[in-house]
Amino acid sequence: MNINPSIIILTINISIIITLLSSVFFFQNETNPSNLNSSSYSLGIFHNTSFNYLFSNSLFFTSLLKTLAILSLFPLFIEIIFNIPDTTVSLFNWLPNNGFSLNVEFRFDLKFNTFLSVALIVSWSILEFSYYYMDNDPNPNNFFRLLIIFLLNMIILTSTNNIFLLFIGWEGVGFLSFLLISWWTSRANANNSAIQAVIYNRVGDIGILLFFSLSITLFNTWSLPEIFSISAPNTFNNLLLVGLLIAAAGKSAQFGLHPWLPAAMEGPTPVFSIRHSSTMVVAGIFLLIRLSPLYACSSNFNTWCLILGSITAIFAATTAISQHDIKKIVAYSTTSQLGLMMVAIGLNQPSIALFHICTHAFFKAMLFLSSGSIIHSLNDEQDIRKMGGLHFILPNTAACIILGSLALSGIPFLPGFYSKDLILEIGLTNFSNFMGIVLSLLATLLTSVYSFRIIFFCFIKNPSFSPLAPINEENNNLTNSLNRLALGTILSGWILTNLTVLVPIITISSVLKTAALLLTITGVLFSISILQELTLNISPPTAYNTNSFTTNQWFYENISHILFLFYSFTISLSLSTRNIDRGWSENIGAQGIAITSSNASQSYQLSQTGYIKQYLLFSFLTLLIIIALSLTTISQLSPSFDI
C-alpha cells in the first residue's frame, strides 16, 4: 500500500494547527513556573513526561511546543526528499453566496514548512526561557497562553490560501502584540508603547484594507490563486501594490512607520523576542513573499521596495551605534535586518528574503534572550556602560551573545554570512541597484560596529556592575533555551542553504563577492580603534554633533511626533473647533436660535416706553400704511380708461 507523501504533509500540518488551537482552552489552573529539565545537557529535549507533573507545574505548553517542533520537521524533510509540489486543502465553504464563496483553505508549500519548523523551534526555546524570566509574575499561565495564540495567528497568516484568513492572522498578531506589550499594566511606558504600536499598525492596516477591498471589487474573489491568474487594469494594479507596500511597511517597521518597534521593548523580554524573531515584525515581509506573483513584473514596485529597505537598514544601523540600552541596540538591529529583507524583495528575490527571515530568527531570538538574562542578573540594569566582565559570572550567556553578535555581523559560516551576504551579492549583479546596495553595504559595515560594541562593553571592558549581582545561570530553563538557539544559529545557515534555498547563479567578480565580508572586517577594526580612543578619553571633534543626530533617531520622532502633531492640532483647532463647534454650531445652531430670538425680543422692548403720544403716533402711521396699501390695490384692480 503506497501512502501519498502529500497526505502525510497535510495531516501533520493540520494536526499542528488544531493542536495549538485546542491547547489554548486547556490548562486553566494557576501555578508557578518551575525548572523544566533534570539535566542541562539535554538542551531541553527530555522532560519529565508525567501528566500530573506537567499539569501541576505549568509545563504543558513547553512540552506541547517541543513535540510540535520535532513533528514539524517531518513535513519539511518529506517535501525536500520527495520534491512534493504545493499541498492545498479546502476544509469547508464558509458564508456561501450565489456570486461569491469563501473557502477556508490552506496552502502547505516549502516556504510555509520551512517557516513553521523555524517558528516552532524558536518559540519552544522562548517559552521555556519564559519559565525562568517570568518566575515571579503573578499570572504566568495567561502569559504563556497569549504567546501560543500569538504564534497560532502567525501560522494562520503564513499558511492560508485566501485573503480573509490572512486578514484574521494579520489582525490577530497585531492585537496580541498590543496585549503582550502592555502585559505589565502598571507601567505607563508599557501602556504608551502598546498604544503607539497599535496606531502605527493602523496606518499599515489602511494598506491591507485597500488591497482587500480592491481584490473583492476587481476579482470578485479572495482566493490567492484566482487573484494571481487574473490580470487587473494597470491603474488598479498599482493601487493594489501601493496597499501592499503600506501594509508591509507598517507591520515590518520600515522607515516612516518604524518608531513603534524600539518602543515596544517595554514589554517582557520573551514578548519582543518572539515578536522580533518569528512572528509579527516579519509578517509584512512574509505578506510580500506570499503575494510575489503580483509584483514579479513590476519594476517600479521593486525599486520602491529596494529604496525603502535600504533607507530603513542604514537608518537603524546608524541609530544603533549610538544607543546605550542593550535592548534598544538589539531592537534597532532587527529594524536594520528587516530593511535588508525588504531589499531582497526589491531585488525580486522573495525566497532569499524568506531565507534571511529563517536564519535571522535563531540568532536574533538568542540575542534577545541573552540580553534578558543579563538584565535579569544585573537587577534590571540595561545600560551597557555599566556592564563589563560579564563572562566571569555569566559564561553561557556571554558565549551566546558573542555568537549572536558574530552571526549578526556576517562572520563566515554563521547564518548571517549565508543569507545577508547573498542579498548583497545579488544586488551587486546589476548597477541599476547602485544607490540601494551602497546604503545596504554601509548598513552592513555599521552592523559589525555596533555588534562589536556590545561585545566590548559587556565582556572586554573592566567590570562595572554591582559586586552583589546575583548569579542566575544555574537555571536549566535559561541555559537549555540559549544552547538550543545557539545550535540553531550554527547549523541553520548551512542546512537551509543546502536543502531549501535555490541560490540563483551570481556572476560577479571576486572583489565584489567579498565586499560584504571586507566591510564586516573593516567595521570591526573601525570600532576597535574608536573604542580605544574613547578609552583614552580622546573624543573626535565631530563626535557630539554626529552622536546627537543618531541618538535622536535622525530627529524623526521630533519631527513626526512634535511638529506634525502640533500643526495637525492647530489646523484642527482652527477648522473644526473654531469654525464648526464655536462657529456654525453656536451662531446658526441651537445657540444661534436663542441669540437671535433674544436680540429680537430686546429690539421689540425698545418700543414699549409707556408714552401715550408714542402709541398714538404708531397707530396713526399704521393707519396711513393701511390706507396707502388699500389705494394701491384698488388702482391695480380697476379697469384702465383711455384719455
UniProtKB/Swiss-Prot annotation:
GO BP of this protein: ATP synthesis coupled electron transport; electron transport coupled proton transport
Reactions performed catalytically: a ubiquinone + NADH + 5 H(+)(in) = a ubiquinol + NAD(+) + 4 H(+)(out)
Matches recorded under InterPro entries: NADH_DH_su5_C, NADHpl_OxRdtase_5_subgr, ND/Mrp_TM, NU5C-like, Proton_antipo_N
Organism, as annotated: Patiria pectinifera
Function text: Core subunit of the mitochondrial membrane respiratory chain NADH dehydrogenase (Complex I) that is believed to belong to the minimal assembly required for catalysis. Complex I functions in the transfer of electrons from NADH to the respiratory chain. The immediate electron acceptor for the enzyme is believed to be ubiquinone.
Name under which the protein is recorded: NADH-ubiquinone oxidoreductase chain 5
Gene Ontology molecular function terms on file: NADH dehydrogenase (ubiquinone) activity
Subcellular location: Mitochondrion inner membrane
Signal peptide: none
Membrane topology, from the record: Multi-pass membrane protein
EC number(s) per entry: 7.1.1.2
Annotated keywords: Electron transport, Membrane, Mitochondrion, Mitochondrion inner membrane, NAD, Respiratory chain, Translocase, Transmembrane, Transmembrane helix, Transport, Ubiquinone
Family note: Belongs to the complex I subunit 5 family.
Transmembrane segments: 7-27, 64-84, 114-134, 140-160, 163-183, 208-228, 230-250, 277-297, 301-321, 338-358, 398-418, 437-457, 486-506, 511-531, 555-575, 615-635
Top-tier EC class: translocase
Main location: mitochondrion
Entry's Gene Ontology cellular component terms: mitochondrial inner membrane
